[in-house]
């Protein structure tokens, strides 16, 4: 219950960064869902949203918040999403909810990326959480072998197909000291669609909600 309260506080703290007339990029996951609830309170002030997943899109529609296809949007001022982990550099691990590729696309399109998390997600070294990788199905074994070669322990996320029609590997036992290098290295493996390491497109602002209040890293 305390964790959910902290997620909600972080989500509502992001509202002050929204400007009238904005089209807002919206992420996926439990913290992003709290942000969608908060966005509903100012839906008449914004132009609409771009969503990273079907689940988020459904919630936005339920609140009668307009949705746009990213290809229709010439300027996306802001993207708000949670993370599985985030460090002081605002590099993140994302993808527990299987929407990492679309999240990375929208984050890259946005002028400003705000990450909203509770304090349990703030770490000094990334890698405690599994690192998700979206993979073309025929390349799953090849990619797994390449990940083992760099010291990771990949596990196939059975029964999950991404909205892009691909599969997921969750990589355990990685201590990520150079996230920029590792993101590039994994992305260069044939068959990898996207890795849930957000270092080259780090957050611009991190909103971290803890027992002592809100901490902002910008």
From Swiss-Prot:
The keyword Isomerase applies. One of its GO terms (cellular component) is cytosol. SUPFAM superfamilies: D-ribose-5-phosphate isomerase (RpiA), lid domain, NagB/RpiA/CoA transferase-like. InterPro entries: NagB/RpiA_transferase-like (IPR037171), Ribose5P_isomerase_typA_subgr (IPR020672), Ribose5P_isomerase_type_A (IPR004788). CDD domains: RPI_A (cd01398). GO terms for biological process: D-ribose metabolic process; pentose-phosphate shunt, non-oxidative branch. The keyword Secreted does not apply. Homodimer. Substrate binds at residues 28-31, 81-84, 94-97, 121. The active site is at residue 103. It comes from the Bacteria. Catalyzes the reversible conversion of ribose-5-phosphate to ribulose 5-phosphate. Gene3D superfamilies: 3.30.70.260, 3.40.50.1360. Its EC number is 5.3.1.6. It is an enzyme of class 5 (isomerase). This is Ribose-5-phosphate isomerase A. One of its GO terms (molecular function) is ribose-5-phosphate isomerase activity. It catalyses: aldehydo-D-ribose 5-phosphate = D-ribulose 5-phosphate.
């Amino acid at each position: 219950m305390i964790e959910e309260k902290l997620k909600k506080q972080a989500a509502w703290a992001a509202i002050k960064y929204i400007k009238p007339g904005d089209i807002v990029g919206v992420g996926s996951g439990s913290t992003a869902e709290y942000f969608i609830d908060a966005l509903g309170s100012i839906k008449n002030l914004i132009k609409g949203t771009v969503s990273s997943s079907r689940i988020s899109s459904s919630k936005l529609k339920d609140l009668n918040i307009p949705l746009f296809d990213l290809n229709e949007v010439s300027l996306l001022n802001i993207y708000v999403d949670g993370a599985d982990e985030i460090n002081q550099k605002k590099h993140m691990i994302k993808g527990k909810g299987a929407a990492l590729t679309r999240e990375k696309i929208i984050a890259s399109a946005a002028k400003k990326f705000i990450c909203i998390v509770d304090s349990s997600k703030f770490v000094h070294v990334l890698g405690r959480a599994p690192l998700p990788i979206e993979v073309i199905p025929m390349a799953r074994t090849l990619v797994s072998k390449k990940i083992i070669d760099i010291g990771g322990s990949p596990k196939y996320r059975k029964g999950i197909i991404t909205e892009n029609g691909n599969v997921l590997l969750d990589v355990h036992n990685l201590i990520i000291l150079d996230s920029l290098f590792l993101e590039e290295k994994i992305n260069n493996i044939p068959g990898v669609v996207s890795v849930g390491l957000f270092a080259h497109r780090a957050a611009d602002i991190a909103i971290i909600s803890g027992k002592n209040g809100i901490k902002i890293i910008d």
